[in-house]
Amino acid sequence: MAKKKEFRQAEVNIGMVGHVDHGKTTLTKALTGIWTDTHSEELRRGITIKIGFADAEIRKCPSCGRYSTSPICPYCGHETEFERRVSFIDAPGHEALMTTMLAGASLMDGAVLVIAANEGVMPQTREHLMALQIVGNKNIVIALNKIELVDREKVIERYQEIKEFVKGTVAENAPIIPISALHGANVDVLLAAIEEFIPTPEHDPNKPPKMLVLRSFDVNKPGTKPEKLVGGVIGGSIVQGKLKVGDEIEIRPGVPYEEHGRIKYEPITTEIVSLQAGGRFVEEAYPGGLVGVGTKLDPYLTKGDLMAGNVVGKPGQLPPVWDELRLEVHLLERVVGTEEELKVEPIKRREVLLLNVGTARTMGLVTGLGKDEIELKLQIPICAEVGDRVAISRQVGSRWRLIGYGFIRE
């Protein structure tokens, strides 16, 4: 008799990153069967996520030793064995969506950098690799995709080109796997590389829970009767600890309110009434994958992503909220993502910079300059730990461009 299939939550988040149209979404579909531009943008009941999430089980065939995401080996027909469940995060590759990609990068435990064989290394390839470097992500596999569009000599040429491109970066020793996502060619080799080079991070379930919020929603349909209304839903990824149905939670920095003509933020507490992970309702949720948290909050507070960038945890156990920051700054030599090579000029006093911290983004006005240090006044406060990494972007022309990173100091 067949055993009842036990549901497992994803245990690792793997980013699909790279230049627009290099095949990230097609590759995610080849690995998971889910087209993330529509399906995973819906966490059931119409919850939309701008960054696509899709879960898959990585399985290994005990007979031929090849990897797949199918219960039956597509290569020899034997039953496969479960290795682990992973969540693929499909990040936008368009230059205008770089800050969205950075929010997703903060949740990635590893990444597949997708480079199309017909185009090679492009501006957003560089930008996404630098984003991974800035958020401190070292577990990288490179997929040289669309090999069906070029001849063998071109594939070898691209391979050498990529080797040169990653020298001196976090991806210097990353394996480069030639694949065709469209035809499923070499996908088993890519999965084997993911298993070898992107380990599941160790999480202590007894640490205070912390979840970074990516989206938030009002799931009530227009015209719902008052007695049928359900509370606001928060979507994000747990980075430590665990959350349970019935837990009291605090959300920081919380909700904005006006006082003496100034906008201030107030933390809010509520109760978890439901949890979704991998599209299923669960009693407990752990780090890995996207988690939907149903709350008792007024849905007015959560509609249209109003809660994005917040941090969720147990009352009194969350990091501090900052409306001013002191950063130890590391500037890049060149601006990342532009067609032409531009030198990164020093940061100036009174300059406005865009800061990404976890899933939060805020503008910061530079109020003080020191040696390798800056002080900023923030437009929107952030909840973060001392020592947290901050991605720093500057407006270059009409776009925000990565120019460096910093660490929060006391």
From Swiss-Prot:
Residues 90-93 are annotated as: G3. It comes from the Archaea. The keyword Zinc applies. Residues 180-182 are annotated as: G5. PROSITE patterns: G_TR_2. Heterotrimer composed of an alpha, a beta and a gamma chain. HAMAP family: eIF_2_gamma. This is Translation initiation factor 2 subunit gamma. The gene is eif2g.
